């Protein structure tokens, strides 16, 4: 069934076409700005009357007379307003009946997409080194709402939970686990409070140079596929995902482990991204880092603003992973890729999308869209910081 506005446009447009003896007319139905003007208002009378050499009020009267002969049950009454608008008052009884039907048979009142497409929605995306906190609430809820709406309208939706499960922080955590916990079998108990575990590990990393160096070596071993380190990493990730699943269950969101699009998925693609950017002459070096400079991006000082894709020490960044993910979604023949991330990342996504286009990682058939929302702040008016210890855990809040 069509939306109310679409339905009213059709009904009144047909009556206007009959009155003007034309093939079609645009009723231009809008939501009324004031209750005294009805629920909706047909504003197309003015322009159509002028087009057919009629007085607006005369055309409005003819339309109302025509409709009254077989007034749809949805419309309670029609009135002429001003120089020739038609104020439309809906039937409360019919609205109640439609609302009841919407609850009992929702598919009848929600129009399906005329052309269903494949959509990837990237949302929630917590860092698995830590517990989810209240700052994750908006992205998770907004993303899941978008997913449900798109699916209800008939689109094929690919949920993408782009969790952070890789990087230097995991070398730090594995090293701390070795010292503080010992055998991997003891990890579940030690990780019952991920937040405290992360803060303790970070403090040790900051205060003890020997520990920090050992943590860096752990990262290398992890990246090189050392079995013991991979085993510890997998146990940590599994336990962290359990924390996330507790939150998702409490929120009644539809994300499952099958929807994971983890950073580690792209490990083997990142060097290829750099090689391809180099082959297209898009890379430039700045202070040892590899960057892409596009003319449409500049800083406040007017200097070109780079998208850094590889650090001077050879490490990769979120931008590199995002480019690899875009290329994968292109191969998956996704037509829209939505990124539900807070507004602070607006420039990041503008640059990533532009570089993806310039490099040919995505074409015009793939729409890349950042769905932004406001940042949740702490009492100090700043974004939450896990290491400060004052973050509200989402599981506890719920």
Predicted regions and their residues:
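NTP-dependent nucleotidyl-transfer catalytic core
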Residues: 17, 23-42, 47, 52-398
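Charged, compositionally biased N-terminal leader segments and the immediate start
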Residues: 1-29
């Amino acid at each position: 069934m069509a939306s109310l506005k679409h339905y009213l446009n059709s009904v009144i447009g047909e009556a206007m076409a009959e009155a003007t003896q034309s093939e079609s007319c645009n009723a231009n139905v809008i939501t009324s700005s004031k209750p005294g003007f009805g629920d909706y208002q047909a504003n197309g009378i003015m322009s159509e009357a002028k087009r057919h050499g009629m007085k607006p009020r005369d055309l409005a009267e003819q339309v109302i007379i025509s409709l009254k002969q077989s007034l749809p049950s949805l419309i309670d009454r029609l009135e002429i307003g001003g120089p020739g608008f038609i104020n439309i008052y809906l039937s409360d009884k019919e609205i109640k009946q439609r609302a009841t039907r919407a609850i009992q048979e929702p598919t009848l009142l929600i129009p399906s997409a005329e052309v269903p497409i494949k959509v990837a929605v990237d949302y929630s995306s917590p860092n698995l080194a830590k517990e989810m906190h209240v700052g994750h609430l908006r992205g998770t809820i907004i993303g899941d709402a978008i997913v449900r709406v798109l699916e209800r309208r008939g689109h094929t939706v690919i949920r993408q939970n782009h969790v952070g499960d890789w990087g230097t922080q995991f070398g730090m955590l594995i090293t701390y686990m070795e010292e503080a916990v010992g055998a991997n079998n003891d990890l579940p108990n030690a990780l019952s409070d991920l937040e405290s575990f992360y803060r303790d590990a970070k403090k040790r990393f900051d205060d003890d140079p020997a520990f920090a160096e050992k943590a860096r070596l752990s990262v290398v071993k992890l990246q090189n596929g050392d079995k013991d380190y991979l085993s510890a990493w997998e146990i940590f990730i599994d336990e962290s995902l359990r924390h996330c699943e507790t939150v998702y269950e409490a929120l009644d969101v539809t994300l499952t482990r099958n929807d994971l699009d983890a950073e580690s998925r792209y490990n083997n693609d990142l060097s290829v991204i750099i090689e391809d950017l180099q082959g297209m002459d898009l890379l430039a070096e700045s202070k040892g880092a590899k960057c892409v400079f596009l003319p449409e991006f500049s800083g406040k000082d007017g200097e070109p603003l780079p998208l850094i894709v590889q650090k001077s020490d050879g490490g990769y960044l979120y931008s590199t992973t995002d480019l690899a993910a875009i290329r994968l979604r292109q191969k998956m023949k996704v037509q829209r890729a939505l990124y539900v991330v807070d507004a602070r990342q607006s420039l990041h996504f503008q640059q990533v999308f532009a570089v993806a286009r310039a490099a040919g990682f995505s074409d015009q058939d793939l729409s890349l869209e950042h769905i932004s929302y406001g940042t949740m702040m702490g009492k100090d008016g700043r974004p939450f910081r896990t290491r400060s210890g004052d973050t509200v855990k989402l599981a506890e809040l719920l």
